A protein has these predicted regions:
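Receiver (REC) domain switch/output surface
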Residues: 107-122
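Acidic, metal-coordinating helix/loop segments flanking the phosphotransfer/catalytic sites
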Residues: 34-50, 58
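Alpha4 helix (beta4-alpha4-beta5 surface) of REC/receiver domains from two-component response regulators
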Residues: 79-98
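Conserved acidic carboxylate
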Residues: 10
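Conserved phosphotransfer microenvironments
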Residues: 49-69, 83-86
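Two-component/phosphorelay signaling modules centered on CheY-like receiver
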Residues: 13-31
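Conserved phosphotransfer cores of two-component systems
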Residues: 44-46, 66-72, 93
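Two-component signal transduction core modules
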Residues: 51, 98-99
Length: 122
């Protein structure tokens, strides 16, 4: 069974388009937000399986707030710089995973339910 929706917010429109296309094979609805407020509205409306959030578009406090606001929804963060300290803080704030923005496959793997990950890896 295909998860229904995913919502993403990216600072780079090219990354947003690439992720949206990649995720459309695994999710019925891929909703690209242009702001944190728009992301919140889309998440409240569509109750996504996961939120993919660029750390250049949000603060650690935003990650923590989203995790509490949308309990049960996976929060996958990404950033263009591979910074272990920042990622550790992000995971501590409540993110389920953190990946480099350039690692589309890693972001997709983190967002897709484990039961479907064998199809993603193929």
């Amino acid at each position: 069974m295909q998860p229904t929706n995913i919502v993403l917010l990216q600072s780079d429109p090219n990354v947003a388009r690439l992720l949206a296309v990649s995720l459309s094979d695994s999710f019925h609805g891929v909703h690209v937000a242009r702001s944190l407020d728009e992301l919140r509205r889309a998440a409240a409306k569509h109750r996504p399986y996961a939120i993919i959030l660029d750390l250049e578009s949000a603060t650690l406090h935003d990650v923590e707030t989203l995790k509490h606001e949308f309990e049960g929804i996976r929060i996958i963060c990404n950033h263009r710089v591979a910074d272990e300290e920042m990622w550790t803080k992000t995971l501590t704030a409540g993110a389920d995973d953190c990946c480099p923005s350039s690692d589309t496959r890693g972001i997709l793997t983190a967002a897709v339910p484990r039961s479907m990950s064998s199809r993603v890896a193929a």
